Amino acid sequence: LGTTRATMPYNDTVNFSSNILGCTSRFPILRKEVICRYQMNGAVVFYLLLNDNDTLRLINCHLQSMGLTAEDREQYHDIVVNPEEKRGGVEKHSRLLVSKISRASVIRAAQADSVAAYIGRNAGKSIIVCGDFNDTPISYTHHRIHSAGLTDAYAATATGLGRSFNRDAIIVRIDHMFCSSHWKP
């Protein structure tokens, strides 16, 4: 912790109920601005002074969670691994899972629209967007941020599926990083 403070002495946070979005940096944090907020989730932009005339807009996101409980994930795992054994409950549990995922997707779409609108208002500026999007690379959320003119750092530099969530037979990449043309991934 002491080494981190010595190399990155600047820190700021925004509290979203029980979640905190923050930025720890070696560059001064000029200010912060909440882009969107919904219950415990949202997006915050931190303005970092890189040098005398260059400001980075660092957008940290923790977008709406699916809201799946440990029991939901266990039922999903059972459906995937043993669909024949769960035949009677598959339809009921599938409907419940789809309902939760649908509700969360609607909220995330609005959050993604807010982040994309911010990016659009700041076109031509130095921007990095990162965080827990709780959505996959084929989602509306990912597409909306990417189509705002940013580069998907993983797609530009990595190979393979990529995964940032791996639990109960759910293996996906839901954490993402995007950058403006000022940055090379």
Regions found by a protein language model. Give the residues of each.
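A solvent-exposed, charged loop/short amphipathic helix patch at secondary-structure junctions
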Residues: 73-100
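Active-site-proximal beta-strand elements of phosphoester/diester hydrolases
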Residues: 55-64, 91-97, 101
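N-terminal short leaders/motifs
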Residues: 1-3, 134-135
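Soluble or luminal CAZymes and related metallo-dependent hydrolases
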Residues: 38-40, 103-114
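Short hydrophobic/aromatic-rich motifs at helix boundaries and adjacent loops
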Residues: 16-17, 84-89, 113-114
